[in-house]
C-alpha cells in the first residue's frame, strides 16, 4: 500500500503484585551514623513502613543522618548463579539468606558493587542495610541471571513472608 511501511513490534511487560503478599518492610533509625553502618541489633526503629522494592524512592525521608533496613523474601524461579548489585550513597550491605554478599559500607558518593551468589529455586531472605551521613541519597538493589542483563528486582518477586 502506498505511504505505508512496516512498523516495529511494541513490547511491554507488566508485573502483577498482590498487596497482601508482595512487599518490602523498611525500618528507619534516627541518629548520627558517621563513617559506617550501625549495629542495628542495638537500635530501636523510629519508623516502620512498607514499599514494593528496595529503594529510597517513594519514601518520605528527612535530611541529615539516618539508617535504614529493607527486609523481604525473594522468589527464585530457576536455580543458578545470580549477580546482585547494590548502589548507595553512603554505606550499604546486602544479605541473602542472612549471609552478607556485598559490603559497600563507609561514607562515599554513589558507588555500586556486585557479587555472584549461587541460589536454589524457591524463597530466599533478602536484606539491605543502609546509612545516610548527609549529601546525596542513593540506594538501589538489582540483579542479573544468565543473559537477562542487570535489572531492578521485580516487585512481583519480593514477598513479605516465605510462605
Model-derived features: positions:
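Extracellular/secretory pathway-exposed regions associated with glycan biology
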Residues: 3-83, 87-163
Amino acid at each position: 500500500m502506498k505511504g505505508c511501511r512496516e512498523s516495529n513490534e511494541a513490547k511491554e511487560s507488566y508485573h502483577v503484585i498482590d498487596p497482601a503478599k508482595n512487599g518490602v518492610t523498611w525500618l528507619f533509625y534516627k541518629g548520627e551514623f558517621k563513617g559506617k553502618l550501625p549495629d542495628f541489633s542495638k537500635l530501636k526503629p523510629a519508623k516502620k513502613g512498607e514499599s514494593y522494592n528496595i529503594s529510597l524512592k517513594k519514601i518520605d525521608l528527612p535530611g541529615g543522618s539516618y539508617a535504614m533496613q529493607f527486609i523481604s523474601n525473594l522468589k527464585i524461579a530457576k536455580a543458578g548463579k545470580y549477580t546482585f548489585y547494590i548502589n548507595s550513597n553512603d554505606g550499604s550491605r546486602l544479605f541473602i539468606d542472612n549471609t552478607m554478599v556485598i559490603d559497600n559500607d563507609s561514607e562515599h558518593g554513589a558507588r555500586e558493587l556486585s557479587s555472584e551468589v549461587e541460589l536454589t529455586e524457591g524463597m530466599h531472605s533478602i536484606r539491605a542495610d543502609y546509612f545516610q551521613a548527609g549529601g546525596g541519597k542513593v540506594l538501589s538493589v538489582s540483579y542479573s541471571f544468565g543473559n537477562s542483563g542487570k535489572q531492578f528486582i521485580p516487585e512481583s518477586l519480593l514477598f513479605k513472608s516465605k510462605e
